[in-house]
Amino acid sequence: AEYTLPDLGWDYAASGPG
């Protein structure tokens, strides 16, 4: 995925905001 937020430990394009 392209949008990765390491501070939250999630992958936006894979997991989504929810």
UniProtKB/Swiss-Prot annotation:
It catalyses: 2 superoxide + 2 H(+) = H2O2 + O2. Its EC number is 1.15.1.1. The keyword Metal-binding applies. Its cofactor is Mn(2+). It is found in: Cytoplasm. Its main location: cytoplasm. GO terms for cellular component: cytoplasm. The keyword Protein biosynthesis does not apply. GO terms for molecular function: metal ion binding; superoxide dismutase activity. It comes from the Bacteria. Destroys superoxide anion radicals which are normally produced within the cells and which are toxic to biological systems. Homodimer. This is Superoxide dismutase [Mn]. The lineage of its organism: Bacteria, Bacillati, Actinomycetota, Actinomycetes, Mycobacteriales.
